[in-house]
A protein has these predicted regions:
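Pre-Walker A-like glycine/lysine-rich segment at the N-terminus of P-loop NTPase domains
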Residues: 1-49, 54-69
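Glycine-rich phosphate-binding loops of NTPases
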Residues: 58-88, 92-220
Length: 220
């Protein structure tokens, strides 16, 4: 089996990015500012279980975030509407196991294969960092910044309440998806995803030259 495609949405500058992974690919290179680091940071956070921060949420989506949370706190929209309107940070992994023997034990991939059709040879996994489906919890966190003595009076620093509580308002959910029927999903554990994709980042070592300047080449 092999990882054949990665899709990332709403992570920093990666609003809607897709990477096709060739079967012979062992190294990804590219020019500066082409989002290589951003790509692997996103993957690393998901696989390590590191929560996303507010800084990871795209600048272009923040006004929508602020406006809809304010509308919810003002009781202009329902929590269900808020939940649907806030776009999550998401990453999809498409795994191809077409070359594996049907009788083989697919091991760590097995929990993510939910279509029992023998003609299906791909597994689709999506992780979403989205608003918690807990209206009371969200309201309790934000209420002090939007209400005073029972009156809707948003504080001047109301945005800071969202920023500082981002990890309390949002959570990660991992789905196994039927590639032939995207409406059919199962929620999976982070441990299952981590076992499927062992992931380790080796940081580039930057050496300081004798003249005090940085040598940006990788050390051997």
């Amino acid at each position: 089996m092999r990882l054949s495609k990665i899709k990332i949405k709403n992570y920093r500058l990666l609003i809607d990015a897709e990477l096709e992974v060739d079967s012979k690919t062992t190294l990804i290179v590219g020019r500066n500012n082409t989002a290589k680091t951003c790509l692997f940071e996103c993957i690393g956070k998901v696989l390590d279980g590191t929560p996303f921060s507010f800084n990871d949420y795209p600048l272009s989506k923040r006004e929508n975030l602020y406006a809809n949370i304010t509308s919810f706190m003002a009781k202009e929209i329902t929590f269900e509407e808020l939940y649907e309107r806030l776009e999550p940070i998401s990453i999809e992994f498409l795994v191809d196991y077409a070359l594996d023997d049907p009788e083989d034990n697919l091991g760590a991939l097995s929990p993510f294969i939910i279509d029992v059709d023998v003609d299906t040879t791909t597994a689709l996994i999506r992780t979403e960092y989205k608003l918690k489906a807990d209206e009371k919890s969200v309201w309790k966190i934000l209420e002090p910044s939007y209400y005073e003595n029972g009156n809707f009076t948003p504080a001047d620093d109301v945005h800071n309440a969202i920023i500082s509580n981002f990890n309390k308002l949002f959570e990660i959910t991992i789905y196994a998806i039927n590639p032939k029927n995207p409406e059919e999903t199962q929620i999976k554990k982070h441990k299952e995803l981590a076992e499927l994709f062992p992931f380790h980042i080796i940081q580039a070592e930057r050496r300081l030259g004798e003249d005090g300047t940085h040598d940006n080449s990788l050390s051997s």
